[in-house]
Amino acid sequence: MTVAVCLQAPTIFERRVIADATAVPIGTIMKLEDANTVVVSAASADPFGGIAWEEHTASEGITEMTVAMNGRWQIVTTAAAIPVGNSVSIGGADTCRLSTEADTIVGTRFGKCLNEIGGGGGTAIVEVGQLI
């Protein structure tokens, strides 16, 4: 699994609830589920719940974790093109894709792509938390 790589440290963090049995590596893109609860993102159009800032080891009795809500990250993209400066959304497990209008409504937009991504996909530099 390829996770997001931090290029510029975030300054905004949230504490989220997570199931004790879930193992999460640092840099995993998280899906916001319910009442401040996150799970590992696995599908396109998942609502953004942050990027894992700490490892969560399964079955240690810990049910909270810290996620980053901003910063600059290197994130693998889906196979679609992303023009520089466009917003990105969750594209699946630890990937991003070009945002659509519908993504604004459901809360999947999470950042701005700072480099041009061609039609075959690639690795985006994403300013997380920056949408304008």
PLM regions with names:
Residues 1-132:
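Surface-exposed, low-hydrophobicity beta-strand/loop segments enriched in small/polar/acidic residues
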